[in-house]
């Protein structure tokens, strides 16, 4: 029975012995404490100011105001700078902004900004100062921090030093629940470096220069590297789905389809400002978030218009300039927002308004245009036809925001932007429709970015639909795949044609006009994979249940050149054709020597595993692996050799090749010798075991009085019996032989 008032003792009711101070209600006070953010969330405290007197104070306030107004709006009368008893300032100021969002932006963008050579600003929210600086939060006595002993970090580029001295590349394989990193051993079994169970929950991904291996988990993203494969960085973005690096590995973007929800107890990396956001941009060096963004809403159809199809999810949603100084985001149909790094403030405080903009893409390298000496990064964009205005392709320079080249286009159904790897060319694949909109054709508009004035060359109209396009890396040739039938989900994929294009020969270093080299018809190909070094290309049929062809081409074949191609800068030759049933992915290694193809269990469960080919299309290795999910070569950073050193290597390439071939032959022969020796050793061990058993059996027979050779003894015992029981028999055999045949005809 529950206790009642009658069960209480008299001493329990004695109020004189009750002390209010002894009751601990700190948990209740903390739970129901009034938060100061409600009244002071638009205030910031600016620390690190120079010491000034009353006469110098107005000048400092005006100078400080210029900095403060770069992120929001405030006035001189909203800046309070306390003065000491000696008439000098206390080196900090209180500033009121017009909104809490501006105050938050000031803390994010002005903190650690230099005011001059000797002073650096520290900006914090007033509410944060009160929250973290109140009584009990800070010790009155100074406690020196514990300085940990210096520990030398592992070299994150150690993978560039192959211990075998053969310059091998590494790759990662994700199969079942296991992730392993291996050295490529060509025909032999890959050499395992590290293999771990449950290393990732969804997928793995290399960083662009190969420094880190990314694992993805429900709690966030982790980066691994070094000889011992320890965790180097951690980014706590709950339920992360996708990851993208900046080209130079300085920054990272994470995305989750679930908006971030900050719990009441807080988050180890994110703040309340990140609540409800989907994207987070991180600084890899510090592992700290720079800024977060929410998912953009799909624009609704205008009244009276048919509802638009849901667009494909854009990834990467944030695109990086080649030097990591800018990151940009598309607001479809309205603008492009360009942010400066690492502050993540909007360039010139405004987005670049481009009516109707559909897509954009940065140049993959910093381009030096003819006659332009100033620094710039370039991106291209395109807009569709709006009313009577034509479609337009533009080339914009950043940070000036100047459109350096534009091109008007008519009767445009769609356009795709394709940069060459060095930014020397931009190809705009334009799908055009006839006036009746019943037929379509494709034109290729090629911008020669490095030439003066950025001239545009139009390649002959292609009547078929172009379904794939790929530039030669560091080159000026390209391959397209076309089809005469509409592209879509069909039971039998349509037949395709593969066309090769290259420039004409020109004097000096000039690049001639682009010309058609050759078209191969009645193919099933749908994907193009160039070697990262150029020259060689694999044209493949992937994710196709009917066909799985792999065609290996050489565009600089050293054999006889057809007369029709004498004036062109290519000599096309099919080197080999392979077949990998169920192939879903193809990837070249960074050296351009090997090609890996694999059938991923993420797409189907038939004959999962990988094949390895050399650049000529000769199969080196085939391995079927159950639940094989992912294969990815480890990227290499750019070479440290100068152009002169690279030219010297090319001049002496034949001599190097002879040395490498000799080393390969020695390695193969030594491997063969090792196999023979191992087999001989096993055979000798077996002979020794057999002899030991024979002696042991002989000793046991001698002990038990048994004959040493039971078979011989048995034959000896049976022979007399057979001689007496059987009579002597004579066996005769008669054989007939035809010596001659004569045929007579009787009439």
Swiss-Prot record:
Keywords: Cytoplasm, Initiation factor, Protein biosynthesis, Repeat, RNA-binding, WD repeat. InterPro entries: EIF3B (IPR011400), eIF3B_RRM (IPR034363), Nucleotide-bd_a/b_plait_sf (IPR012677), RBD_domain_sf (IPR035979), RRM_dom (IPR000504), TIF_beta_prop-like (IPR013979), WD40/YVTN_repeat-like_dom_sf (IPR015943). GO terms for cellular component: cytoplasmic stress granule; eukaryotic 43S preinitiation complex; eukaryotic 48S preinitiation complex; eukaryotic translation initiation factor 3 complex; eukaryotic translation initiation factor 3 complex, eIF3e; eukaryotic translation initiation factor 3 complex, eIF3m; multi-eIF complex. It holds the Pfam family eIF2A. GO terms for molecular function: identical protein binding; RNA binding; translation initiation factor activity; translation initiation factor binding. Residues 42-128 form the RRM domain. Its main location: cytoplasm. PROSITE patterns: RRM. WD repeats lie at residues 195-234, 236-292, 310-349, 520-563, 578-623. The keyword Protein biosynthesis applies. CDD domains: RRM_eIF3B. GO terms for biological process: formation of cytoplasmic translation initiation complex; translational initiation. It is found in: Cytoplasm. The keyword Translocase does not apply. Belongs to the eIF-3 subunit B family. RNA-binding component of the eukaryotic translation initiation factor 3 (eIF-3) complex, which is involved in protein synthesis of a specialized repertoire of mRNAs and, together with other initiation factors, stimulates binding of mRNA and methionyl-tRNAi to the 40S ribosome. The eIF-3 complex specifically targets and initiates translation of a subset of mRNAs involved in cell proliferation. Component of the eukaryotic translation initiation factor 3 (eIF-3) complex. PANTHER family: EUKARYOTIC TRANSLATION INITIATION FACTOR 3 EIF3 -RELATED, EUKARYOTIC TRANSLATION INITIATION FACTOR 3 SUBUNIT B. This is Eukaryotic translation initiation factor 3 subunit B. The gene is prt-1.
